[in-house]
């Protein structure tokens, strides 16, 4: 795909999820294969537990950016110290569970600012996880919540913004409400993105296509299986970039 300015912008919004089996060499083969076709590589619990900081550093050595998707959720001091470690790793973005509360989020923001300033490192985006895309209203009721997923997402997004976070991770179905409540500068990262055909074994319930998610206001899209299981993963990534570009044009 020719990298015009609009395509470059769409590429930077595409996050590839490195959620797969195999060894470090297998994971890095995906990074090398897709570098230049996606903007960010997401390192989640599966990959980080197996390979640790070495994986983050190996990705960065290719010139690519990293989204550290560990969803920190603990007492404020513990999360703040973990966040400082994320700054030292030089990741472009990382996340915390907004359900960890206001104190946890505000202390994390302050610690990250201090660490980045002290080490003269770039300030990463700090994202609040709202409601996992695998959960629906029935799931929340079983957990004891009396609100809908949309209501809880909006409440947590506002709390994250008040705490000073850069943005949130939220389903595309919640993007418009978040954008209206939190404004145009609040970053929204959207998982649960699928192609026109759903992936076999899909366990995410609140999903949309890339074009529709961007049209609604998503800033970054997390895509894994639809690229990884495609016959031609590079072509699939390029197709998603084109979808993103169409969504941007339709805003």
Curated annotation (Swiss-Prot):
Write down what this protein is called.
Answer: Orotidine 5'-phosphate decarboxylase
Please name the HAMAP family in this protein's record: OMPdecase_type1_B (MF_01200_B)
Pathway info? Pyrimidine metabolism; UMP biosynthesis via de novo pathway; UMP from orotate: step 2/2
- Broad enzyme group: lyase
Protein purpose: Catalyzes the decarboxylation of orotidine 5'-monophosphate (OMP) to uridine 5'-monophosphate (UMP).
- According to its UniProt record, which residues of this chain constitute the active site? 71 (proton donor)
- In terms of superkingdom, the source organism counts as Bacteria
Gene Ontology BP terms: 'de novo' pyrimidine nucleobase biosynthetic process; 'de novo' UMP biosynthetic process
SUPFAM superfamilies according to UniProt? Ribulose-phoshate binding barrel
Q: What is its EC number?
A: 4.1.1.23
Q: Which residues bind substrate?
A: 19, 42, 69-78, 133, 194, 204, 224-225
- GO CC annotations? cytosol
Q: How does it assemble?
A: Homodimer.
Q: Which GO terms describe its molecular function?
A: orotidine-5'-phosphate decarboxylase activity
Family recorded in the similarity comment: Belongs to the OMP decarboxylase family. Type 1 subfamily.
Q: Which UniProt keywords apply?
A: Decarboxylase, Lyase, Pyrimidine biosynthesis
Q: Which reaction does it catalyse?
A: orotidine 5'-phosphate + H(+) = UMP + CO2
Originating organism = Syntrophus aciditrophicus (strain SB)
Upper classification of the organism: Bacteria, Pseudomonadati, Thermodesulfobacteriota, Syntrophia, Syntrophales
């Amino acid at each position: 795909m020719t990298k015009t300015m609009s395509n470059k912008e769409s590429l930077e919004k595409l996050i590839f999820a490195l959620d797969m089996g195999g060894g470090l060499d297998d994971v890095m083969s995906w990074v090398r294969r897709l570098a230049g076709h996606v903007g960010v590589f997401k390192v989640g619990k599966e990959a980080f537990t197996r390979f640790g900081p070495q994986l983050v550093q190996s990705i960065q050595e290719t010139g690519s950016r990293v989204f550290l998707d560990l969803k920190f959720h603990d007492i404020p001091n513990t999360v703040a110290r973990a966040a400082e470690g994320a700054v030292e790793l030089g990741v472009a973005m990382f996340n915390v569970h907004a359900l960890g509360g206001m104190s946890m989020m505000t202390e994390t923001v302050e610690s990250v600012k201090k660490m980045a300033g002290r080490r003269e490192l770039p300030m990463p985006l700090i994202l609040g996880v709202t409601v996992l895309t695998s959960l629906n209203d029935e799931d929340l009721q079983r957990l004891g919540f009396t609100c809908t997923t949309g209501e809880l997402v909006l409440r947590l997004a506002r709390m994250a913004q008040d705490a000073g976070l850069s943005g949130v991770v939220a389903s595309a179905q919640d993007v418009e409400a978040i954008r209206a409540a939190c404004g145009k500068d609040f970053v929204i990262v959207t998982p649960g993105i699928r192609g026109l055909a759903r992936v076999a074994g899909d366990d995410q319930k609140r999903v949309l296509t890339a074009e529709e998610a961007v049209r609604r206001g998503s800033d970054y899209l997390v895509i894994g299986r639809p690229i990884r299981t495609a016959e031609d993963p590079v072509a699939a990534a390029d197709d998603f970039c084109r979808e993103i570009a169409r969504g941007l044009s339709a805003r």
